[in-house]
């Protein structure tokens, strides 16, 4: 086995149909109706407007969830890899030991202080999609998202140790061992 470490970013997934990081339709260039991506993808937005935050991430997940890994993902499937991509395509390609240094849209954690390392769980996107499969109503979608992520639809306040948060490193967060930063530093 080679001692080569591969580090990848958004360009790797472009051939699978995922826009590049800041391209014309990129993940970080398309915001919500009222907020920029840099405002949406923050812990502060998750706390202040969890319904908007979750709707924004959900719409990205639904758009990308059925895409397939491309030849680069497959080539990297047995390599030592750190990826900045949150799309999960490296996992779908068969790489079970890569480090998703920015997290993964397929996973969630319980909402904790940033220093706390918690177990990862499967994201409840399927549950949300099943409940809203025939509806284009964003208000219904917000309600279902809040319920699936254990956030009160009355208070709209995520609760520490109870609510779920997408396993994604946000702009106003820092690397911790939740994102396997210590392990990445030793590669």
Predicted regions and their residues:
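Conserved catalytic core of sirtuin-type NAD+-dependent deacylases
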Residues: 1-187
């Amino acid at each position: 086995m080679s001692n080569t470490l591969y580090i990848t970013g958004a360009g790797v997934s472009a051939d699978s149909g995922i826009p590049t990081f800041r391209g014309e339709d990129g993940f970080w260039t398309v915001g919500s109706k009222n907020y920029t991506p840099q405002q949406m993808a923050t812990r502060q937005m998750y706390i202040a407007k969890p319904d908007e935050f979750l709707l924004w991430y959900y719409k990205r997940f639904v758009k990308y969830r059925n895409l397939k890994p491309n030849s680069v993902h497959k080539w990297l499937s047995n390599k030592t890899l750190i990826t900045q991509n949150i799309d999960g395509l490296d996992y779908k390609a068969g790489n079970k030991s890569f480090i998703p240094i920015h997290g993964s849209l397929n996973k969630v954690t319980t909402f904790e202080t940033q220093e706390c390392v918690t177990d990862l769980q499967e994201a409840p996107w399927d549950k949300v999609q099943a409940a809203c499969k025939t509806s284009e109503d964003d208000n219904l979608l917000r309600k279902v998202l809040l319920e699936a992520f254990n956030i009160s639809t009355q208070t709209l306040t995520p609760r520490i140790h109870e609510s779920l948060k997408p396993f994604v490193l946000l702009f106003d967060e820092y690397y911790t061992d939740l994102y396997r930063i210590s392990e990445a530093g030793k590669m």
